[in-house]
Amino acid sequence: MTSNSHVKIGIIGGSGLDDPDILEGRTERYVVTPYGKPSDALILGKIKNVDCVLLARHGRQHTIMPTNVNYQANIWALKEEGCTHLLVTTACGSLREDIQPGDIVLIDQFIDRTTKRVQTFYDGQPTSPPGVCHIPMAEPFCSKTREVLLEVAQGLGVKCHTRGTMVTIEGPRFSSRAESLMFRQWGADVINMTTVPEVVLAKEAGLCYASIAMATDYDCWKEHEEAVCVDNVLKTMKENANKASSILLTAIPQICQMDWDSTINAHKSMSQSSVMLPKH
């Protein structure tokens, strides 16, 4: 089967997973959006002959804390660059015994505990699109894209949990033990600081969005386990980053071989029909 020329993959790399060396023939492009500048330059190139655009969520030097990431500009820039899919990576803490440090989780739901972030492109600013967008979030992630990632992970022999609920906290601090225990009671499986509002904005943009979450620790709910700290997170990420990279490098050419017309049209249709325009 020939490759699908309509598919372009945006990759948003989280902690330790934003290496531009995965791209062939790469060039950099600095852009400005109606929402300001993205976290860093867009890095354009190919992965196994598939057009891709890489963006470091926290900047290439990891200088932007989760609250200050310009999620609006990041998603807008990737959409304007022609991306149809967003494959993102994120470090996370595990809230479940069976999700061990180093495991991959293909999250399918989220709980939002952020407090300081704009979650829509339709924010009433003069340079923003008109109207109010009430985007449905019953299924926040693209199920078809998730299925591809799952099949690839299983084929590579990577330990991968097929679904999971991510609770996104504001940060940059980690949770208290009481919070961590509460999130477990709520049904959350993993915890991070970036999934929201990124997934919401991708849904508004009509993109096929899926997240590869890598557990680095057990947060702090396990009383006899060392609580999460930066050193342990970075150590686990360094040891296991190749898992996420392998999934991406294998999945991207497979995605490009598939027919995405109906899926892309469905995402776009939902995005467009969710906007209530002002009456004249």
From Swiss-Prot:
Q: Which InterPro entries does the record match to this protein?
A: MTAP, Nucleoside_phosphorylase_d, Nucleoside_phosphorylase_sf, Purine_phosphorylase-2_CS
Q: Which reaction does it catalyse?
A: S-methyl-5'-thioadenosine + phosphate = 5-(methylsulfanyl)-alpha-D-ribose 1-phosphate + adenine
Repeat in keyword set: no
GO cellular component annotations, sorted alphabetically?
Answer: cytosol; nucleus
Q: Where does phosphate bind?
A: S15, R57, H58, T90, A91, T194
Disulfide bonds listed in the record: none
Q: Name one GO biological process term.
A: purine ribonucleoside salvage
- Highest taxon in the source lineage: Eukaryota
This molecule's function is given as:
Catalyzes the reversible phosphorylation of S-methyl-5'-thioadenosine (MTA) to adenine and 5-methylthioribose-1-phosphate. Involved in the breakdown of MTA, a major by-product of polyamine biosynthesis. Responsible for the first step in the methionine salvage pathway after MTA has been generated from S-adenosylmethionine. Has broad substrate specificity with 6-aminopurine nucleosides as preferred substrates.
What keyword terms does UniProt attach to this protein?
A: Cytoplasm, Glycosyltransferase, Nucleus, Purine salvage, Transferase
Q: How does it assemble?
A: Homotrimer.
**UniProt entry tagged with the keyword Ubl conjugation:** no
EC annotation from Swiss-Prot or TrEMBL: 2.4.2.28
For this entry, the protein name equals: S-methyl-5'-thioadenosine phosphorylase
Site location (Important for substrate specificity): S175, V230
Where in the cell? Cytoplasm; Nucleus
